[in-house]
C-alpha cells in the first residue's frame, strides 16, 4: 500500500516493503513524524499526487519533506543533486510495480487465467494510483476503479463471514 516503506538493504539495493508506516505516523509527506520514505512519498515526489489537493484539499502534503527523505536513499545509491529524489521515487515505483506484477502473474498462473482481456479492479487508498502501471506491466485489458476505492476493503471486511477455527494438538 501507500504506507509501504522504501529502503536500502545491506548491499544498497532499493527495496519496498514489507514494513509500513501505516497512517500514523504515516509517510514523511504527512508531516506527522514519519521519517522513512514510503510509496506515498514517491507519488508526491513524482507528481502523481498533488500535495495541495490530497483528500480533496483537506490535507496538504509536505513535498519537500518527501524529497529530503528520498534524497537520503539517493545518497546511498550514489545519486547526487536535486533530481536524485525523483529518480529514487521513480525507481521505487518501478520496483513496486514489478513486485505486484510478479505476484499477480503467479496468482493468474495458478488459476490458469490468461490476463489479456481481463480487468484489474483497483481498491484501497493507493490502489488506483498503482493500477494503470500494474495493468500495463501484467498485460491486462484495463482497469476498473470503483466510486469509493478507499472504502472497498472496509466494506469487504464488514460483509465477510466471521469464522473461528479451534485446533488442538493430540
Tell me what each language-model feature is.
Residues 1-170:
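N-terminally biased helix-coil "hinge/interface" segments that flank
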Amino acid at each position: 500500500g501507500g504506507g509501504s516503506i522504501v529502503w536500502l538493504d545491506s548491499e544498497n539495493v532499493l527495496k519496498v516493503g514489507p514494513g509500513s508506516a501505516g497512517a500514523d505516523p504515516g509517510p514523511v509527506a504527512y508531516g506527522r513524524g514519519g521519517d522513512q520514505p514510503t510509496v506515498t512519498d514517491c507519488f508526491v515526489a513524482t507528481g502523481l499526487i498533488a500535495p495541495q489537493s490530497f483528500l480533496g484539499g483537506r490535507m496538504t502534503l509536505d513535498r519537500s519533506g518527501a524529497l529530503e527523505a528520498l534524497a537520503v536513499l539517493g545518497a546511498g545509491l550514489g545519486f547526487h543533486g536535486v533530481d536524485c529524489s525523483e529518480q529514487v521515487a521513480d525507481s521505487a515505483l518501478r520496483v513496486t510495480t514489478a513486485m505486484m506484477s510478479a505476484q499477480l502473474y503467479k496468482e493468474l498462473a495458478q488459476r490458469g487465467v490468461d490476463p489479456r482481456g481481463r480487468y484489474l479492479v483497483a481498491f484501497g487508498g493507493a490502489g488506483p494510483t498503482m493500477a494503470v502501471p500494474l495493468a500495463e506491466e501484467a498485460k491486462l485489458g484495463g482497469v476498473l476503479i470503483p466510486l469509493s476505492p478507499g472504502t472497498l476493503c472496509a466494506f469487504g471486511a464488514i460483509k465477510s463471514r466471521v469464522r473461528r477455527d479451534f485446533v488442538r494438538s493430540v
